Swiss-Prot record:
HAMAP family: glutarate_hydroxylase. This is Glutarate 2-hydroxylase. It comes from Escherichia coli (strain 55989 / EAEC). The lineage of its organism: Bacteria, Pseudomonadati, Pseudomonadota, Gammaproteobacteria, Enterobacterales. Belongs to the glutarate hydroxylase family. One of its GO terms (molecular function) is oxidoreductase activity, acting on paired donors, with incorporation or reduction of molecular oxygen, with 2-oxoglutarate as one donor, and the other dehydrogenated. Acts as an alpha-ketoglutarate-dependent dioxygenase catalyzing hydroxylation of glutarate (GA) to L-2-hydroxyglutarate (L2HG). Functions in a L-lysine degradation pathway that proceeds via cadaverine, glutarate and L-2-hydroxyglutarate.
Length: 325
């Protein structure tokens, strides 16, 4: 089996006219598409969901699907199939999404509503133990004393998959920029598995399918360890990953050395994309075959970035891990 997959255009022509949004290839890669909601769509969406504060979406989970339907209806029901087609397409699987008119931290609640609507057109966002909600908001500042690299600004946050230390399947990851002050650097880093030049070597290694222990630090509010291999396959036999260097716990010398070499091979890949994400925009990626991370920031005493994330499962597909769910 050849683990590399050629890049093909989306079955829906990226030059096609859509109702309520536009779609173009990104400057970084044809695998990453940029979807922009028009000013009119954004305005109508916010007007129609204004009656529900974010707290209502937190307390009544069915409302998350309601706001998704409102957004899809405003896009002539072209949005949901486009999202699913793109995210389930192995040759793509990633979107940078923007809504004209949403670009300021004062609109943070509107950002949460928009991201929630998009996410719940493809599936459902899982409970986030770190925040106690279906989403998490967190801040990166110039000085950090936390117990993981999530908020540390002056180093690269290495490429990884989300959901490695929980039992729930994590098919997608959504990462939104809510605020940014005195920032230079800190671009999102992305790597598609099929663009990783060392994939075949590590996917075929005897340790690739050995269950390993993943344990989270206290800030994640997850006390139970989980066991799964770093690599698995989807229903078509293609490689997928569940990996993060911070939380995998090698049991012996052999595993430790292999994981260290794996980490180096990922971080030095020539296939890594550097993607700026302005305030109000968000990345939505297939977590099974995209790794994500963050570049370092330039130090500044008043540095501040606020992010929002959602992670969940696809409700319209069965592209899950085949052997260790």
């Amino acid at each position: 089996m050849n683990a590399l997959t050629a890049v093909h255009n989306n079955a829906v022509d990226s030059g096609q006219d859509y109702s309520g949004f536009t779609l173009i290839p990104s400057a970084q890669s044809p695998r990453l598409l940029e979807l922009t909601f028009t000013e009119q769509t954004t305005k109508q969406f916010l007007e129609q969901v204004a009656e529900w504060p974010v707290q209502a979406l937190e307390y009544k989970s069915f409302l998350r699907f309601r706001v998704g339907k409102i957004l899809d209806d405003l896009c002539a029901n072209q949005l949901q199939p486009l999202l699913l087609k793109t995210l389930l397409n192995r040759a793509e699987g990633a979107l940078l999404i923007n809504a004209v008119g949403i670009d300021d931290v004062a609109q943070a609640d509107e950002m949460v509503k928009l991201a929630t609507a998009v996410a719940h057109l493809i599936g459902r966002s899982n409970f986030d133990a770190m925040s106690g909600q279906y989403y998490a908001r967190f801040v990166v500042k110039n000085v950090d004393n936390s117990d993981s690299y999530l908020r540390q600004p002056h180093r690269v946050m290495e490429l990884h998959n989300d959901g490695t230390y929980v039992e729930e399947i994590t098919d997608y990851v959504l990462m939104m920029k809510i605020d940014e002050q005195n920032m230079q650097g800190g671009n999102s880093l992305l790597l598609h598995l099929d663009d990783w030049e060392h994939l075949d070597h590590y996917f075929r290694h005897p340790l690739a399918r050995r269950p390993m222990r993943f344990a989270a630090p206290p800030s994640k509010n997850v006390s139970k360890d989980v066991f799964h291999p770093v690599f698995d396959v989807d229903q078509q036999g293609r490689p997928v990953m569940r990996y993060i260097d911070q939380f995998v716990q090698p049991k012996d010398f052999e595993e430790g050395v292999w994981l260290s070499e794996l980490s180096d091979a990922i971080e030095t890949s020539k296939g890594i994309l550097s993607v700026p994400v302005p305030v109000g925009k968000f990345l939505l990626i297939n977590n099974l075959f995209w790794l994500h991370g963050r570049d370092r920031f330039t130090p500044h005493p008043d540095l501040r970035r606020e992010l929002m994330r959602q992670r969940g499962y696809f409700a319209y597909a069965t592209h899950h891990y085949q052997t260790h769910q």
